[in-house]
Amino acid sequence: MPHQLLINGELVSGEGEKQPVYNPATGEVILEIAEASPAQVDAAVRAADRAFAEWGQTTPKARAELLLTLADVIEENAQTFAELESQNCGKPLHCALNDEIPAIVDVFRFFAGAARCLNGLAAGEYLEGHTSMIRRDPVGVVASIAPWNYPLMMAAWKLAPALAAGNCVVIKPSEITPLTALKLAEFAKDIFPPGVLNVLFGRGKTVGDPLTGHEKVRMVSLTGSIATGEHIIQHTAPSIKRTHMELGGKAPVIVFDDADLDAVVEGVRTFGFYNAGQDCTAACRIYAQKGIYDALVEKLGAAVASLKTGSPNDESTELGPLSSQAHLERVTKAVEEAKALGHINVVTGGQKLDGAGYYFAPTLLAGAKQEDAIVQREVFGPVVSMTVFDDEEQVLAWANDTQYGLASSVWTKDVGRAHRLSARLQYGCTWVNTHFMLVSEMPHGGQKRSGYGKDMSLYGLEDYTVIRHIMVKH
């Protein structure tokens, strides 16, 4: 079982306090891992800083070859990574193996190629006797903080563009789900030069704060909660570090009277509840037009009730447990508060499940109002709300009336309406007649309190660079 840190090309045990790592399907402790000590955090950052002097000057081809090697290793060890992810996160094993690992491999391969296409946009004589050039250079040492919902995938989203651009990275996975990142460290040790990639373990207060606040760290990339994002922005402000924030969402799913209801039902059944709803783009906030609202409630209620919750090792399991006991309690509280409102109708689910593990029943709540907390706040669990709307202007206003701005979807046969809504929705991504689809070539990132900066795509690669102007007199 992986339990060591990667610092300056060496696997070492943590010197800090031991923390338990749980299997959320059973509630049992898998193992205890020692956190990085303050001295080890400092050593990792300084190793990255030393390595940057050479790594930042390597050719894109050289960096690409190592990223491709890492992609191959992950692919060759897909079963191992999937089993660790399933055990540590509670994900159905078949989802981790068949959905997530191939996407992770693709991210590394995409950025390996993208590294060789990065260039400046201008070169020429803008002043007589002088030639100007634009360079895109690496930032330096990047501190990356990965979340617990997709531990290895989010690590890939952060590592691939940062390394491709020529940065050196110190990454801290969530202390709840560290196993796949620590396993990745075991392979990365023999691929990258010492110090280029460092992997730490520990809590935010004990490891995250000294890491993100370190004087040698020039950029911090976070996928996490708004509260964590606020803390890191404030914590790093005195040193004026670049920050890259993906901070969650509450995706509106706008369903018009002319929508294909069967497609909507299948889309929400799948993408409202994938990963037990622990996804910042989950289709969790449905607005259904009044002409089809009742029919959609009935159809979707039956579909959600048919979802199978069970052991992650069962091929027929569609939903595993939530990530932790604390998160189970948060989701339970949010649903109980919604149920206490007289106008909320629990169509199906609405409670935690008996037995071992952190399981919550797939839940559909109808009759929600725009001002309800269940509509306004991210639950991050297998919980979907439904609200009826009258017309296009009303639903546009409601969809945008939130602190979040990550993802949204519009379901209609009217192409003009789809374009109108897409142009006015205040979200980083809007899908039309689908939801949740992501590809390495297209950017992912939010607006408003969902954060800023892009993951994936060439835009994501550019976020890990600095633009520099070089002027030569001749």
From Swiss-Prot:
Keywords: NAD, Oxidoreductase. This is Gamma-aminobutyraldehyde dehydrogenase. Signal peptide: none annotated. PROSITE patterns: ALDEHYDE_DEHYDR_GLU (PS00687). It comes from Citrobacter koseri (strain ATCC BAA-895 / CDC 4225-83 / SGSC4696). Pathway: Amine and polyamine degradation; putrescine degradation; 4-aminobutanoate from 4-aminobutanal: step 1/1; Amino-acid degradation. One of its GO terms (molecular function) is aminobutyraldehyde dehydrogenase (NAD+) activity. The keyword DNA damage does not apply. Catalyzes the oxidation 4-aminobutanal (gamma-aminobutyraldehyde) to 4-aminobutanoate (gamma-aminobutyrate or GABA). This is the second step in one of two pathways for putrescine degradation, where putrescine is converted into 4-aminobutanoate via 4-aminobutanal. Also functions as a 5-aminopentanal dehydrogenase in a a L-lysine degradation pathway to succinate that proceeds via cadaverine, glutarate and L-2-hydroxyglutarate. It catalyses: 4-aminobutanal + NAD(+) + H2O = 4-aminobutanoate + NADH + 2 H(+); 5-aminopentanal + NAD(+) + H2O = 5-aminopentanoate + NADH + 2 H(+). Its EC number is 1.2.1.19, 1.2.1.-. Homotetramer. Belongs to the aldehyde dehydrogenase family. Gamma-aminobutyraldehyde dehydrogenase subfamily. One of its GO terms (biological process) is L-lysine catabolic process. It holds the Pfam family Aldedh. CDD domains: ALDH_ABALDH-YdcW. SUPFAM superfamilies: ALDH-like (SSF53720). NAD(+) binds at residues 146-148, 172-175, 209, 225-228, 280. 4-aminobutanal can spontaneously cyclize to 1-pyrroline, and 5-aminopentanal to 1-piperideine. InterPro entries: Ald_DH/histidinol_DH (IPR016161), Ald_DH_C (IPR016163), Ald_DH_CS_GLU (IPR029510), Ald_DH_N (IPR016162), Aldehyde_DH_dom (IPR015590), Aminobutyraldehyde_DH (IPR015657), PatD (IPR017749). It comes from the Bacteria.
